[in-house]
Amino acid sequence: MIIRSPEPEVKIVVDRDPIKTSFEAWARPGHFSRTIAKGPDTTTWIWNLHADAHDFDSHTSDLEEISRKVFSAHFGQLSIIFLWLSGMYFHGARFSNYEAWLSDPTHIRPSAQVVWPIVGQEILNGDVGGGFRGIQITSGFFQIWRASGITSELQLYCTAIGALVFAALMLFAGWFHYHKAAPKLAWFQDVESMLNHHLAGLLGLGSLSWAGHQIHVSLPINQFLDAGVDPKEIPLPHEFILNRDLLAQLYPSFAEGATPFFTLNWSKYAEFLTFRGGLDPITGGLWLSDIAHHHLAIAILFLIAGHMYRTNWGIGHGLKDILEAHKGPFTGQGHKGLYEILTTSWHAQLALNLAMLGSLTIVVAHHMYSMPPYPYLATDYGTQLSLFTHHMWIGGFLIVGAAAHAAIFMVRDYDPTTRYNDLLDRVLRHRDAIISHLNWACIFLGFHSFGLYIHNDTMSALGRPQDMFSDTAIQLQPIFAQWVQNTHALAPVATAPGATTGTSLAWGGGELVAVGGKVALLPIPLGTADFLVHHIHAFTIHVTVLILLKGVLFARSSRLIPDKANLGFRFPCDGPGRGGTCQVSAWDHVFLGLFWMYNSISVVIFHFSWKMQSDVWGSISDQGVVTHITGGNFAQSSITINGWLRDFLWAQASQVIQSYGSSLSAYGLFFLGAHFVWAFSLMFLFSGRGYWQELIESIVWAHNKLKVAPATQPRALSIVQGRAVGVTHYLLGGIATTWAFFLARIIAVG
């Protein structure tokens, strides 16, 4: 038994009026840095200003002040998010065909952007059905609005105004908690209280209120919409909330109120809290009653979780105790010291959060198509493709960000004198073994995955199809993936006796779901083609991890540069006279990691786009015959590199290349322009700084001759600045090219 002295009561502490509100600093660019505040001598000044403006660590070493700045900045971020959301809702209210779409979501396509005729751009306003002309949107907002029970554009206006009010409130909060009542450091470090409030408040009460909204507002309104009732005839949300009889007409058990809850007769509520599984055949989305049930269950879990941590009352878990008890037989001190790291280094904390949030975002991408949550989402192929692509990119960026901040933690916040024989120290001590093994795995995966394709290209070129790896010749079936699919398809009767259908139709087993003559989802077959491309996924992901992990583990020191920590997070080379030491900073690893992240995600979204068009998406005839968009060509075409180039990139680019003169022509222009942005990046990535400095000198000479030379000396970009500009344009150009290619294609054929 552990006997503890009574814990001191947690006091909520703030400093009153710590920093005077003043706009004077705004008039002094770079006021946060003594060097930058002096003003520009050379053009490098503007780059340093942007690089350091939000690097709060470089402004002060006072952790409390840094914490307050970060906290305040978060409110600013939330304000921008509310402003953006308000804009989305305002467009839905002012420029959209939402009410028309609501009346016929299978034939009318969503649009919430109408182009003004200035020099002929009105060609972009395509006919989306129902007599409306505008740009087809693929964000999924219409589907979310229908699911949440919004039936008129007036409601969208009101929500837009509400979001503006919240944006203003967030701006105020950011000012208030920095200038008027700024929390002390102890408040930011009180993890138990933070966990309780975030778990019970944000996630618990948040889910509970959403479940309440879904039960009292969404479910009845969607019942009426599904039955074909005119949206204008449906009672308004507050009528359902205030008038129980209205709900009781749809769900008789509502008449009994909360009695079944308190008498533990919960099965009464099974009318609107269901456990069906599968998709609603009318809308092609998950059953709304399943979703409400899910949020209620999640709310209860998080409300319990939000009461688990020890604060003012001496009961519950302490994070420090949990971490320090975390010792294995082979892990030395285990997690001892991790608590101190995570409460004093916000970079370490952020790295963990970004890694988890990035992984979660990628999980979301995969669930949006396999378990489409909103009505009429599954048959809106443009939106499905956009949501998958968007969440994959975001997840990739967040994971690279995790490595970036882990490396910054290693350089700025890691104290090797206090860390001995804990898990982090042990990982660092055998980093050579980790990195060399990971490198071997990358080489193995690269040669073998690519080698299978090269073999197929060669056999195909030599006219020997019988010697190729394919479903019709030498089969390489993904037996483990098929086993996972099959296990889940059989679950409803076996391991999940309460469920009537599997979690996702993609597992197999069920009949396909079609809405309005279009396939929503069907069992997705996996074969040799998927086996091949999945090993390319394994390869690209492992290389990305290799680069990023090497950057973190060698951020402070390496055999090549033992004193790397003294050089900082980003530096070009280890000074003159030391050749071969460029591109070794932790920043450079993030820079290189971004390119491989881009490789990884590109292959994933290409695979998804082609696989869905080939094997899932398509139309269904009255006789039940399914015609897929690309007629099932994935299995035979994607097993060679040539097939990817010819039958995916080239064949499916025809829509964007031929879009001129049509309502899709903006995508054609973006396709061209984004290629240009991408190519522009190469000028920065393949350039020598000296080349540009020489050029600048002669241009300055000409300006001096004409007596028009500026006072600020022009300088070529530093090596790091050039790389930053290069990778930004590379990713921006590449992503925008893909976006134009995907959307022109899927809007034309989907």
From Swiss-Prot:
A Pfam family in this protein?
Answer: PsaA_PsaB
Annotated catalysed reactions: reduced [plastocyanin] + hnu + oxidized [2Fe-2S]-[ferredoxin] = oxidized [plastocyanin] + reduced [2Fe-2S]-[ferredoxin]
Q: Which amino acids does the record list as binding chlorophyll a? A: 683, 691
Binding site residues for phylloquinone: 692
Q: Where does [4Fe-4S] cluster bind?
A: 573, 582
Which SUPFAM superfamilies does this entry report, sorted A to Z?
Photosystem I subunits PsaA/PsaB
Record note on cofactor: P700 is a chlorophyll a/chlorophyll a' dimer, A0 is one or more chlorophyll a, A1 is one or both phylloquinones and FX is a shared 4Fe-4S iron-sulfur center.
Q: Where in the cell is it found?
A: Plastid, Chloroplast thylakoid membrane
A cellular-component GO term for this protein: photosystem I
Glycosyltransferase: is it a keyword of this entry?
Answer: no
- What EC number(s) has UniProt assigned to this enzyme? 1.97.1.12
Task: Specify whether Transmembrane is a keyword of the entry.
Answer: yes
Q: Which GO terms describe its molecular function?
A: 4 iron, 4 sulfur cluster binding; chlorophyll binding; electron transfer activity; magnesium ion binding; oxidoreductase activity
The record ties this protein, via InterPro entries, to:
PSI_PsaA, PSI_PsaA/B, PSI_PsaA/B_CS, PSI_PsaA/B_sf
**Which PANTHER family would you find in this protein's record?**
OUTER MEMBRANE PROTEIN, OMPA-RELATED, PHOTOSYSTEM I P700 CHLOROPHYLL A APOPROTEIN A1-RELATED
Q: What is this protein called?
A: Photosystem I P700 chlorophyll a apoprotein A1
Give the organism, scientific name. Acorus calamus (Sweet flag)
